[in-house]
């Protein structure tokens, strides 16, 4: 099952009331929806909560061009190929690999967010292809788990 397209959709809605963190005031809720399409007709979806939205969307679509034609079920191979772009590679410096030049180090948080959104979408495809919820695909057996949430740190 081959990857045929990767799209990034920036989403933003105004908050009814501002939200505060230690660093900023937020007047809107934003995220990026990542869609990976396959030649088998399956679509996987991932989510990114990082910005700036235009930069992260551009990175997702740039990565999509690099992984087009790869096996959508081989998420580790995709991850390794994209992760290789995050630092200088001896093979690239000698002209011996077919990947683009390394990405700017100052954009590492956005690069890793883009990579993560694609990875989540590939896991979604893997679960759909196996006709299993992801927790079962990963070996989960519990019907209930304890949760904890925090925010605004």
What are these regions (language model features)?
Residues 14-17, 86-87, 146-147:
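Short, solvent-exposed polar/charged micro-motifs at secondary-structure junctions
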Residues 9-12, 88, 153:
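Active-site/binding-pocket entry motifs
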Residues 144-153:
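Active-site mouth loops of central-metabolism enzymes
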Residues 37-129:
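Metal- or metallocofactor-binding catalytic centers and their adjacent structured scaffolds
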Residues 1-49:
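Structured beta-strand/loop patches that form or line metal/cofactor-binding pockets in enzymes
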Residues 31-33, 117, 144:
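Broad gene-expression machinery/nucleic-acid interaction feature
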Residues 137-142:
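Flexible hinge/switch segments at interdomain interfaces of large molecular machines
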